Amino acid sequence: LHLLSRRQRQMCIRDSAYNAYDDKRTALYLLNNILGGPGMNSRLNVALRERRGLVYNVESNLTSYTDTGAFCIYFGTDPEDVDTCLKLTYKELKRMRDMKMTSSQLAAAKKQLIGQICVASDNFENNALSMAKTFLHYNKFENLAVVCKRIEALTADDLLEVANEMFAEEYLSTLIYR
């Protein structure tokens, strides 16, 4: 048996999240996209990777099930940068809890998420899976226009409320894989 030396530390910060039937899940999806979504402009990517070069990859993800949900922030970093990365991550979460988004920030975030959804909807397999999942959960089909309308209806107050419910440090668990 040969054990490999792992230089990097893998981090996971997580919390339970809204289930698939909770109306607040749309606001959390938008917050998730702003915080650590696939765009290079996500807040965690800018804070940890672009400004400081502390991580190669940082992302957050959200999964909603019928009875619960899961929210997770993931990144890998060098052992000496773990504390700095954690402090910066919690600083971004606090910023999302304390500062209401401006109307231009909110509009840009909505536009980005809707754009990502539209691009994903060009894939027939993604469309079929999405329709099947929606029908199984809700016994109805929501087309792209309905989803976009739900995102467009979100307000800065909605996001602030959800950020305060979801991103409080006392509810988050941190796992460091060595």
Each model region followed by its residue ranges:
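Extended, charge-rich low-complexity interaction segments
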Residues: 21-24, 33, 137, 152
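Short, conserved catalytic/metal-binding micro-motifs enriched in Asp/Glu and His
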Residues: 29, 159, 174
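Single conserved hydrophobic/aromatic residue that forms the stacking wall/gate
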Residues: 1-12
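Active/ligand-binding-proximal structured segments within catalytic/core domains
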Residues: 13, 23-35, 43-48
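Conserved phosphate-interacting/catalytic interface
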Residues: 39
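M16 family metallopeptidases and their MPP-like homologs
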Residues: 13-16, 45, 49-98, 103-154, ...
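Low-complexity, intrinsically disordered Gly/Pro/Thr-rich segments
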Residues: 155-164
